[in-house]
């Protein structure tokens, strides 16, 4: 999901319906640009729990799954976006299918870390005080358990491309003025994955969200490193898009998986938003990207 909450009841219904009828109720949903509970009112409110729970309740009302919401709220005014909105990434998850590993959640300025191959705090933000994330949404790591297997899902919304040249604009070659900042964020993410795999080589990782860069970019390469597979990069080239901007289809939304999940993933962008206008019923300006993972032959992991 890529949009700002809280939003009108009509918009909430559109989003909820798309989750139920278009992407068929995934076990875990990454949410992007969730606003705090009073939207753009700049009064110091940072929690977005009511915003997330409003969406979860609407999904249930419409006959969908009974999702739970989890987040770590940002510090006031520190994560970019519209002043007062305090946008953040977060998760919905279906507790009938997956378990959020029960631990104390990290604090807004507390860096996620591993202990004995599992998240020490859950969920937790990745290196939130690092200068690379100044005025940018911090990535959120959450560890889930599915049939005895553990997977760390990392939600991301990297630095905006605002100020970059259009890919097919008048200025050629196009200059990506903001990419250097995203590459630094990407290195932080890859280092985090490396540490998790160093402690627990069987740990599964899935990185999702709006990376604000293309599947072939240096940002994507830095995230993947030698540890991850970029599923969008391996997808049919004609179908590699989740966003439409200035006349071109683009794949800003990607999914990376750890190599121990290679051959066990079915991936697809679901084109229900980017190619349509609001009057045609779209729920967001980004398409959702979806991955199905098969854990049936996974080796049991240490507790």
Spans of features found by a protein language model:
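Divalent cation-coordinating acidic motifs and surrounding scaffolds
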Residues: 1-301
